Amino acid sequence: MRRLRPSAAALIAARAGLAVGAALMMPATLSIVRHVFQDERERALAIGIWASVASAGAALGPVVGGVLLEFFWWGSVFLINVPVVAIALLLALPAIPACGGQSRRPWDALGSLQVMFGLVGVVYAIKELSARAPDFGLAVLAALGGMLCLYLFVRRQRRAREPMIDFALFRNRRFARGVAVALVATMALVGMELVFSQHLQLVQGLTPLKAGLFVLPIPLASLVVGPLAGWLVPRWGENRVMCASLLLGSAGLLGLALSYQSATGAQLASLVLLGVGFGGAMTAASTAVMLNVDEQSSGMAAAIEDVSYELGGVIGVTLLGSLMSLVYGMSLRLPSAELPARVRDSLDDALLVAEGLAPEVASRLVELARQAFDQAFVAVLLAAAALLFLSAMAVLRQPRPATEPAPPAPHTR
């Protein structure tokens, strides 16, 4: 891509195009599942398969990216999407059923701008406050501007005759719970992947390919457990499946925090637990979202769930990434007062600075920087584990809906 046009603006625009395409495609796929399968148990199983493929595909991204970066030009991580999309389009067109849409619904351009600027303002404020020398005035201004835009967006949607987001859907607690679980699970997974990929490459010294292969248990476990969770939801209920999945994910993160310096087997077992928890949580959350709206609202419900995934990723990177930077900067003890202040920004900066230092000072700086990063790494994993555990407890405290299936009676002879 850069060979075609060596411009940062072009790269950002291309990334924005990818995001728009994904935002249009993912809700449509889930809405199709909702339309095609009418039996509730079949629909739950189909959603489980959908969730397992979606979560596995997202987690496989680092693996494929590692392979491409190992053997090809870095722009190949973008160009690989072209043949994949072309093949998927050719295979999908004959199989996708025709579903009548609401073509009269207008596009709310102002509402789209309000929510976009609102999220950008809040996210920027959080990132600015976590910087080494934050501009508090700018951060407060961005936060206030962002919250004002979000308030105006909510007010506009509540008054609109055909809103982008019908907030009345959230009156259904099962729907709202599914959206919340999807957001929280994505926050934890993306935050974990952010720090773990850096730990594998910058601390353990793995190549991008080996680092991608190391996290392969997550998508594989998600792929296997998704259909199983879809089969369990109609029998055990959404609450139980979500609670169990969140607890398994929390256990996986806790295990990784305790075993990251241990044998590889212990780390891989923790990653499998995390994959099982994430796959189960995504399936149960998707089922709760899609089975608690009428068919006419399925497209909007699918879009809301997709937003929860994307927003969870943004919040996970922002909050847990900020926590990582904060703990790293506070934990780093510099071997010399003459070192540039940017070594406290990140481990990557410290390693770059070390390349221009005397061997003894460089070796000491690298050692101390990696120790500080280890502390930040553990802090992020523990925070993500606590988030999933508290979410599981919140789900557990919710009353079981009358329409949710009771657990099967014990088998008696």
Label every model-predicted segment.
Residues 1-110, 137:
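Helix-loop-helix hairpins in multi-pass membrane proteins, especially solute transporters
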Residues 60-69, 122, 229, 316, ...:
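Small-residue (Gly/Pro/Ala) motifs that create kinks and tight helix-helix packing interfaces
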Residues 10, 135-145, 149, 158-333, ...:
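12-transmembrane solute porter fold
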Residues 287, 352-413:
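Transmembrane-helix exit segments and adjacent C-terminal regions of multi-pass membrane proteins
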Residues 19, 47-58, 62, 111, ...:
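Structural signature of transmembrane alpha-helices in multi-pass secondary transporters
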Residues 20, 82-89, 150, 250-251, ...:
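Small-residue-rich packing faces within the transmembrane alpha-helices of Major Facilitator Superfamily
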Residues 48, 70-182, 188, 206, ...:
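Hydrophobic transmembrane-helix bundles of small-molecule transporters
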